[in-house]
């Protein structure tokens, strides 16, 4: 009795031993994975309308074997993957979601054109891919109307560009700005329009000018630059037409002499004039009667005595 009285206070406050199959925390918090369960025939009276699918709801496809998932534990969130919707599987879904899923999977030939949101096959259907790759028709712009006469065999000169978008009064200013990107060989101004065709010395200079498309000059003029497609301008200039003019920026103008170097006209006396004057007939002749100092003994004695 004494041993039982000593043990009794300890056993009264301690919890009873847990049962073999009881758990205090849900399995998803303990990191337990759902164990695979072999498919078993189930009656229609069981709750689980997600597993009951007819061929009509599946879009006419033959019925597939349904693998039921184990029953979720109390208080646990759903454990199915988010990719189950993409695969078209209704396993682990509620009955309401299982009814909506077959309708989302059924696609008619026109469903790709309608683009119903929420359907995955719209992004991968051949009809939608064909619509994405279809090019839009050419827009109506001045360059497109000029390019009607071009064919695939025509080869354009890449050194030509077309500058447009400036008022006619600022044509010389724009031409001076584009002269900073390279050596301009020729340029053709439009008589009535707001564009001009410019030819550079190299293709690299033309590409540098093409990169200035959309640049604002003088804080008021936005300029557009495109490759020149006016083949008539290129052909007329190649034949030596008088409509072209060579533009050289004043900053890069070299200083050339006004007369050829082969025939110099100088007003300065050449350096050889002094040598020619020394050999002329007029020379200074020394006089023979020029007095000289006497170096004799008597003159030295007189200079010593009298100080002469």
From Swiss-Prot:
Keywords: mRNA transport, Nuclear pore complex, Nucleus, Phosphoprotein, Protein transport, Translocation, Transport
The RRM Nup35-type domain, residue ranges: 155-235
Coiled-coil residues: none
Subcellular location: Nucleus, Nuclear pore complex
Keyword flag Zinc-finger: no
GO biological process, one term: nuclear pore organization
Domain of life: Eukaryota
Region called Disordered, residue ranges: 1-80, 242-265
GO MF annotation, one: nucleic acid binding
PANTHER family according to UniProt: NUCLEOPORIN NUP35
Record family assignment: Belongs to the Nup35 family.
Descriptive protein name: Nucleoporin NUP35
Organism: Danio rerio
């Amino acid at each position: 009795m004494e041993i039982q009285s000593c043990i009794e206070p300890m056993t009264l406050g301690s919890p009873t031993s847990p049962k073999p199959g009881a758990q205090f925390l849900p399995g998803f918090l303990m990191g337990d994975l759902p164990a695979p369960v072999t498919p078993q025939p189930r009656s229609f009276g069981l709750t689980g309308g997600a597993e009951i699918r007819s061929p009509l709801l599946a879009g006419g496809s033959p019925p597939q074997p349904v693998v039921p998932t184990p029953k979720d534990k109390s208080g646990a969130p759903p454990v199915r993957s988010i990719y189950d919707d993409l695969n078209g599987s209704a396993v682990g879904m509620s009955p309401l979601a299982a009814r909506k899923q077959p309708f989302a999977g059924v696609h008619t030939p026109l469903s790709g054109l309608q683009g119903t949101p929420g359907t995955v096959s719209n992004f991968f259907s051949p009809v939608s891919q064909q619509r994405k790759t279809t090019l839009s028709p050419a827009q109506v712009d001045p360059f497109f109307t000029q390019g009607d006469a071009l064919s695939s065999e025509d080869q354009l000169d890449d050194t030509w560009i077309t500058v447009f978008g400036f008022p006619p009064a600022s044509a010389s200013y724009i031409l001076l700005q584009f002269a900073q990107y390279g050596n301009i060989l020729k340029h053709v101004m439009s008589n009535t329009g707001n564009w001009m065709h410019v030819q550079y010395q190299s293709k690299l200079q033309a590409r540098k000018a093409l990169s200035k498309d959309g640049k604002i000059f003088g804080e008021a003029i936005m300029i557009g630059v495109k490759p020149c497609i006016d083949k008539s301008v290129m052909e007329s200039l190649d034949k030596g037409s008088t409509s072209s003019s060579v533009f050289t920026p004043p900053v890069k103008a070299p200083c050339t002499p006004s007369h050829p170097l082969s025939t110099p006209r100088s007003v300065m006396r050449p350096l050889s004039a002094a040598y020619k004057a020394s050999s002329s007939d007029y020379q200074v002749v020394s006089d023979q009667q020029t007095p000289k100092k006497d170096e004799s003994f008597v003159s030295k004695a007189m200079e010593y005595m009298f100080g002469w």
